[in-house]
């Protein structure tokens, strides 16, 4: 099976637990005979592409047009992830499944699903309501609603 992992963090970029989960899951899936491609954010002096013991890792820039607004930053990242996924599909063919890791990649995952008919598996590693003991402001409501949108797909 050809699996596309979408995540905003993958080693060496580790923000929380997502990077470790995606890394370990990808390695296990390779061991089980699957093809795994990861598209993630490029931070610092890391290559745009690497083969991490069988896991093909593609990193994309984020141009940070408005770095003070995290939601805008995430949307820009989703556009760049989507562009890279489209490029890979054009070159290598369609993926069998997309595994979207958390709300941060919702829009690229949803667009790929709708454009190519690729099913989505989604993992919300920590819900917004759980992290904050409820939803208390509009920013949290936006993240909560985006989590719902991803898991509804």
Provide a role label for each language-model segment:
Residues 1-56:
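N-terminal subdomain of nucleotide-sugar transferases
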Residues 99-100, 151:
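Short beta-strand scaffold positions
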Residues 100-105, 124:
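Short His-centered aromatic/hydrophobic patch
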Residues 128, 140-153:
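Membrane-proximal helix-turn-helix segments that form the acceptor-binding/catalytic region
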Residues 55-86, 138-139:
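A short, charged, and often flexible helix/loop element on the N-terminal side
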Residues 123-140:
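A short, histidine- and acid-enriched strand-loop-helix "catalytic/donor-clamping" loop
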Residues 88-94:
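Glycine-rich phosphate-binding loop signature in dinucleotide/nucleotide-binding domains
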């Amino acid at each position: 099976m050809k699996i596309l992992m979408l995540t905003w963090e993958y080693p060496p970029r580790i923000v929380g637990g997502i990077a470790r989960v995606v890394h370990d899951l990808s390695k296990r899936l390779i061991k089980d005979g699957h093809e795994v491609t990861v598209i993630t954010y490029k931070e610092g002096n890391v290559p745009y592409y690497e083969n991490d013991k069988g896991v093909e890792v593609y990193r994309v820039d984020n141009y940070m047009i408005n770095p003070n607004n995290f939601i805008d930053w995430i949307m820009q990242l989703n556009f760049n992830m989507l562009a890279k996924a489209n490029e890979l599909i054009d070159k290598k063919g369609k993926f069998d499944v997309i595994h979207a890791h958390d709300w941060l990649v919702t829009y690229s995952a949803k667009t790929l699903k709708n454009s190519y008919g690729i099913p989505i598996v989604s993992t919300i590693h920590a819900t917004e309501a759980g992290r904050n003991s409820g939803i208390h402001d509009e920013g949290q409501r936006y993240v909560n609603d985006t989590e719902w949108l991803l898991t509804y797909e």
